[in-house]
Amino acid sequence: RNGSGKTTTANIIMGHPDYEVESGIVELNGENLLEMETWERARKGVFLSFQYPQSVPGLQVGNFLRKSVAAILGDEAAKGSEFRKKLKESMKELDIPASFLGRYVNDGFSGGEKKRFEILQLMLIKPKLAILDETDSGLDIDGIRTVAKGINAAIRGTDSGALIITHYSRILEHVQPDKIHVLIAGKIVKTGGPELALELEEKGYDWLETGSDK
């Protein structure tokens, strides 16, 4: 539900400066992320796909991607034929044309282009934890399928994980979740497997607030 704390949770994990955590820890691979700066969390493998990505006029997509990969994975990862091959393969997977690289970051992008660009970054960086904040929002069925294909390609065969924040179960038809958590008023009120998504589609959320399972 809107206002339940989903985006707040994502921003806290990533280290947004507007949020202060008074207690608790956020642990990844045995390390407390709350003790790190945002850039340190990124280098440790945390990636956040924004719900509303900002445009950056004057910065070309190709340059942005190369610099991003270099900043997270090191300069060598952003050089040579191997990087170009991976970039080309990832763009093909997401149905992104080569001309996209010459455009400015999110400048004049459609909603679908912004979402695919976020997933393109995910595929190139291959983080340990990808936080995808309503990546499926505003997409049609084909768009959801394409984005899901990119998510699967990024985490398949790795020890990486994805925290997918969504209002709907449609994307879960293409990205198989291990666990589903329902967040209401800042608290996890229900946890289950993939079948929980179907139950929520059928019943909505009111039964979780009232405590009834009818």
Set out the residue ranges of the language-model regions.
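Helix-to-loop junction immediately C-terminal to a conserved catalytic motif
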Residues: 14
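ABC ATPase NBD Q-loop/coupling interface
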Residues: 25-41, 106
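Walker B catalytic motif
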Residues: 134-135, 142
